Amino acid sequence: MISVGIDVSKGKSTVCILKPYGEIMCSPFEMLHGEKELNALDDLLNKLDGEIRIVMEATGIYHLPILTFFHEKGYFVSVINPFAMKKYAKDSSIRGAKTDKLDSIMIANYGIEKWFKLQRYKGDEEIYAELKLLGRRYRHYMELHVKALQELTHILDLSLIHISEPTRPY
């Protein structure tokens, strides 16, 4: 029973590896989201004896490279809702300043305490995540398009003020 808690940030993560009763197998350390670092963590996990579960908090899109990497390697990966993690942190005995190292320890502890309730990530969620990302991009580009049209209208209104019915190019 080994819980790998990963506190994901933009471009880097903090990793802590715990066994039951708070036994720290690997002190919290930082790693980048590059292939080299992910392979190094994979090698470290392969050397460990016991069932391994990787636990991370959902962070918009930042957790996706790590999630995809370990899911494709066949690991049990669980993505936790940030609200559930916040509630757990509030009820947890780990208090004090909020740091990435403490967060990774808390996430690993969550994995140990909720071991049998953890839900394994399913691959088809990738499709929904990609659709969500594409939807966000579409909305963003539509907002840019509308702003550009509004700006063009303002420029035409200012420059063609003497013409009663301006011919618009759109």
Give the label of every model feature segment.
Residues 1-19, 107:
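Gly/Thr-rich phosphate-binding beta-strand-loop-beta motif of the actin/hexokinase/Hsp70
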Residues 11-36:
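Short glycine-rich, Thr/Ser-proximal phosphate-binding strand/loop in the N-terminal lobe
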Residues 36-53:
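Short, basic/hydrophobic alpha-helical segments
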Residues 55-65:
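Acidic, metal-coordinating catalytic cores used for nucleic-acid/nucleotide bond scission
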Residues 71:
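Anion (oxyanion) recognition and catalysis
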Residues 78-119:
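Short alpha-helix plus adjacent loop in nuclease-associated cores
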Residues 131-148, 152-155:
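Amphipathic alpha-helical coiled-coil segments
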Residues 161-170:
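Single conserved hydrophobic/aromatic residue that forms the stacking wall/gate
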